[in-house]
Amino acid sequence: MATDDSSGLECVDQGGHRGPGGDDPFAVWCEMREREGARVTLIQLYALVAKPRGLEPHELPLAERRELAARATPLMWPGFEYNERSKPRERQPVEVVAYDQGWPERFEAWRGRLVGLLGPVALRIEHVGSTSVPGLAAKPVVDIQVSVANLGDEDRYVPPCEAAGLQFRLRDDEHRYFQPPPGKPRHVHVHVCQQGAEWERVHLLFRDYLRCSAGAREAYAAAKREATRLWGNDRPAYTEAKTDVILGILDQAGAWAAATGWGIRG
């Protein structure tokens, strides 16, 4: 979920040097992102590269889009880095399916496993993402958010998550991400975050608002359908294509939270 404002962003080339704007699409995109924050997405970078060639963003060759995404990701997600011990999974097209009544059961099974392995290190274990919202179409992957007291103390939670059969794939300033290793079904993702941080709050608020707002659910479902149509073979772009709708829903959710007294339970 792209919600950072990326303040203080530096526009750098692949050699690590700050570049001017001018006609360089990447530098222009960086300046746009620095001014306007997360509403300037990877799709705009694709557009800046594609337009002079008479192409639509989704018409850029996939290999070129992947290079652009790899260059932009550290700027969109400060602190981003892959765990050098992890192995990349084979790239698969985005698949969005109808809501499955079995997703909550899958979450509960994984929750029990994580509780047993993490013990008191896990201050909160929550089902988040689209599979946590009854009736909402989703990628068939259960997202689990684990809140801890100290995100930087990886030795306390990385080994237990790995013992659950997950690999520690990447980190950024806000969370740590675990997924099944290559060769295993991709049916669960675990996101470890700092208790009380914005990452924790935003994902729980987004979930709870979608659960109670049919209009927000339909808007999000429509965004998913369109993103899949255009970007089904490009996972970073699929995620980024939903940004405007997500930020709009979060604005509504913020007003709803203020009106209802919503807060993180417990």
Q: Language-model segments: what does each one mean?
A:
Residues 1-4:
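Low-complexity, glycine/proline/serine-enriched flexible coil segments
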Residues 10-17:
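Residues flanking N-terminal targeting/processing segments that define the start of mature chains
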Residues 20-23:
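Hydrophobic helix segments
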Residues 57-126, 247:
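Helical scaffold of the NTase/Pol beta-like nucleotidyltransferase catalytic core
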Residues 82, 198-266:
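Catalytic cores of NTP-dependent nucleotidyl/adenyl transfer enzymes across multiple folds
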Residues 113-155:
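Active-site nucleotide-donor binding segment shared across nucleotidyl transfer reactions
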Residues 166-198:
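Conserved catalytic core of two-metal-ion nucleotidyltransferases
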